[in-house]
Amino acid sequence: MDHNQYLLTMFFADDDSFFKYLASQDDESSLSDILQITQYLDFLLLLLIQSKNKLEAVGHCYESLSEEYRQLTKFTDSQDFKKLFNKVPIVTDGRVKLNKGYLFDFVISLMRFKKESALATTAIDPVRYIDPRRDIAFSNVMDILKSNKAKNNYSLLSS
C-alpha cells in the first residue's frame, strides 16, 4: 500500500487513528504527512468550487459553499458536538485502524483522479476559501476600497 493511500484512509476514517499515527511520528514526518493531505484536500476543494460555479451558472445557489452559509455541521445532540471539539491529548499506545473497504476504494479513486485530471496538471496555487468576515487582511483591503469609493462619491457630489 502506498504511503499516501495509508495516510488518506486514516485521515478520512471516522476514528482517531490518524491522530494516533501522527502522535507516534517525529515532527518533520508529521508535517510532511499533513502537507500531503492538504494537497489532496486542496484538489477536492478545487473540484467543489468548480462544481459550485457550474451550479451558479445555471442559476442555482449552492448554500454549502456560499458566503452566507453559517452551519457547517449539524448536531443531533450535544454528544456529537463534544466529540467533534474534544481536544484531549491522544493516547499513543492504541492501535491504528485502517479501513480497507469503501473508504480505501474512495482514496484510491481520488488519487487516480488527481493524477489523471487536467486540473492537477496545470500549475495551480493552493485553493483556499476566504471568508471576508474572518480574514483580517482581506477585511482591511475591503475597508480601504470602500473608503476610497466613499471619497470618490463625495468628491463627485461636491463638484
From Swiss-Prot:
Its main location: virion. GO terms for cellular component: host cell cytoplasm; virion component. The keyword Nuclease does not apply. This is Virion assembly protein OPG100. Induction: Expressed in the late phase of the viral replicative cycle. It comes from the Viruses. The keyword NADP does not apply. Homodimer. Part of a complex composed of the kinase OPG054, OPG092, OPG114, OPG115, OPG142 and OPG157. Interacts with OPG175. Keywords: Host cytoplasm, Late protein, Virion. The gene is OPG100. It holds the Pfam family Pox_J1. It is found in: Virion; Host cytoplasm. Belongs to the orthopoxvirus OPG100 family. Late protein which is a part of a large complex required for early virion morphogenesis. This complex participates in the formation of virosomes and the incorporation of virosomal contents into nascent immature virions. Plays a role in DNA packaging during immature virions (IV) formation.
